[in-house]
């Protein structure tokens, strides 16, 4: 589907952004549009494509977040937060170091 292609391309950008952010994390891409980010303390952030809802879902220690494609980005329905801004905050929290993620 068009959505799956869009989401998969975004997941690849997210993976590259996390790999290049300088944080000491392990990132693994799994089948079905899933990224698993593991931190030194054993905590994880899971980022996945949710095709039925047409969203990218993020599960972190501080909660779950759902993002929809709009205006060239991915925006949370709940509070209007942008995907990369949210991921920067979540990765920073769990890595214990300030990290800024940007889409390439």
What is each model feature region?
Residues 1-104:
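N-terminal intrinsically disordered, cationic/polar leader segments
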């Amino acid at each position: 589907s068009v959505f799956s292609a869009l989401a998969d391309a975004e997941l690849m950008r997210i993976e590259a952004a996390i790999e290049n952010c300088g944080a000491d994390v392990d990132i693994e891409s799994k089948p079905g549009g899933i990224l698993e980010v593991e931190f030194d303390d054993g905590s994880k952030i899971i980022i996945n494509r949710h095709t039925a809802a047409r969203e990218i879902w993020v599960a972190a220690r501080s909660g779950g977040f759902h993002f929809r494609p709009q205006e060239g980005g991915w925006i949370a329905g709940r509070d209007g937060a942008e995907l990369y801004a949210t991921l920067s905050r979540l990765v920073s929290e769990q890595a214990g170091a300030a990290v800024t993620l940007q889409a390439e």
